[in-house]
């Protein structure tokens, strides 16, 4: 569902809060640059999407002129809702790297 920039930020906040209160599920965020069509004279824009499984998909198109202001608000929303993130366990990957490098040089 394509929303205005303000509506997108409100819906994204609601979506992240819903998942945080449930304690399960994932929200995927993506960005894609839209190329400039020289024939139409339009400016460059960025498509930003948020997806919560198959249940809810929201998106907005941000014009390059408003991108800095929008991205500051977008970052605040995301940072405010990342409380539930788990720190990645890197111990396993470090052990695997040591095994491959030490066994490779005999």
Swiss-Prot record:
Subcellular compartments: Cytoplasm
Coiled coil spans: none
Chain's role: Component of the signal recognition particle (SRP) complex, a ribonucleoprotein complex that mediates the cotranslational targeting of secretory and membrane proteins to the endoplasmic reticulum (ER).
The keyword RNA-binding belongs to this UniProt entry's keyword annotation: yes
Entries under Gene3D superfamilies matching the protein: Signal recognition particle alu RNA binding heterodimer, srp9/1 (3.30.720.10)
Quaternary state and interactors: Component of a fungal signal recognition particle (SRP) complex that consists of a 7SL RNA molecule (scR1) and at least six protein subunits: srp72, srp68, srp54, sec65, srp21 and srp14.
Gene Ontology MF annotations: 7S RNA binding; endoplasmic reticulum signal peptide binding
GO cellular component: nucleolus; nucleus; signal recognition particle, endoplasmic reticulum targeting
Keywords: Cytoplasm, Ribonucleoprotein, RNA-binding, Signal recognition particle
BP GO terms, sorted: intracellular protein transport; protein targeting to ER; SRP-dependent cotranslational protein targeting to membrane, signal sequence recognition
A Pfam family per the record: SRP14
Primary location: cytoplasm
PANTHER family: SIGNAL RECOGNITION PARTICLE 14 KD PROTEIN
Biased composition (Basic residues): 86-100
Protein name as annotated: Signal recognition particle subunit srp14
Record family assignment: Belongs to the SRP14 family.
The organism's place on the tree of life at top rank: Eukaryota
InterPro entries: Signal_recog_particle_SRP14, Signal_recog_particle_SRP9/14
Disulphides: none
Region (Disordered): 86-106
Ribonucleoprotein in keyword set: yes
